[in-house]
Amino acid sequence: MWPLLHVLWLALVCGSVHTTLSKSDAKKAASKMLLEKTQFSDKPVQDRGLVVTDIKAEDVVLEHRSYCSSRARERNFAGEVLGYVTPWNSHGYDVAKVFGSKFTQISPVWLQLKRRGREMFEITGLHDVDQGWMRAVKKHAKGVRIVPRLLFEDWTYDDFRNVLDSEDEIEELSKTVAQVAKNQHFDGFVVEVWSQLLSQKHVGLIHMLTHLAEALHQARLLVILVIPPAVTPGTDQLGMFTHKEFEQLAPILDGFSLMTYDYSTSQQPGPNAPLSWIRACVQVLDPKSQWRSKILLGLNFYGMDYAASKDAREPVIGARYVQTLKDHRPRVVWDSQAAEHFFEYKKNRGGRHVVFYPTLKSLQVRLELARELGVGVSIWELGQGLDYFYDLL
């Protein structure tokens, strides 16, 4: 594990006070509100000296809303870029409209596929579909494809067994999915199913996904599969989806949304996605670089807040991150091994915390790695990040 973090975490648990403000100092600090720019910039973050390891809390607060509007439709990353949008972080809808040209696919998290009985399937969540928003995104970004996430929800083991063992069930499932895509003017789907099924049924799942892809491709629709990391976090063991499965599905599917985040746990706090682990996940999947362009390296636009006293963690999105920087003005530290920033702060009654959240530098390093490996990226999710992140894409 990361030596620097071990030292920090020991200090948190033992109650070190060397970086804690006195009450009088805290009152003085609170009286000086940190400023936030509300206007666009005529230069991207790369030209403003902001993509650095030595960042300051006040600079993040000041600059995070200020993106380069004149280049909002220009791409800096040549590979595939998939961006997820969720109804519970609605700012992502605006991000997709403003920066849509920087993406090849946008995936709204709207839909669930449910089995209602023998050869009976239903896609729920259609009440969340926003046709006006879809038209607006495509109006400003001509080449972008709208591919909603389709989650296999409330499936029992018997549901999977009955479907995977029946060609008629698979055909009916594929028809249902293709028909909804046609009716709703979707360009395909991001399918999330792999992590919900035990490994002994993966042969049948590959068979089903192959048939589903054939049906959707006949309708000129895309199929992207969400896959877990190929290397289990914190170990050298292979994950649930490895080179064996990738080799079978890569010629058939259009992409793979690789979940290279959530590396650390509340029991072992640390970085969200260490760089060496990300690299290993890609290399294990495709060691010969045959299908690398179909791998979409997962980038988290959220962070984690670890509480030392409670042995717990909570996700952190952009607004909370900025507010924490305002309230505590912490010293932000660069972990060179993981290539991520983190900081420590203390709540009045809640004990000590450490926060890992993406920064311009950590994202730039990962985009450079994606270029080196020849892969695309997938972002979870657009409503959780800071606006100036998109200058990098």
From Swiss-Prot:
One of its GO terms (biological process) is carbohydrate metabolic process. Residues 79-393 form the GH18 domain. It is found in: Secreted; Lysosome. CDD domains: GH18_SI-CLP. One of its GO terms (cellular component) is late endosome. InterPro entries: Chitinase_II/V-like_cat, Chitinase_insertion_sf, Glyco_hydro18_cat, Glycoside_hydrolase_SF. Keywords: Immunity, Innate immunity, Lysosome, Secreted, Signal. Interacts with STAB1. Saccharide- and LPS-binding protein with possible roles in pathogen sensing and endotoxin neutralization. Ligand-binding specificity relates to the length of the oligosaccharides, with preference for chitotetraose (in vitro). This is Chitinase domain-containing protein 1. It comes from Mus musculus (Mouse).
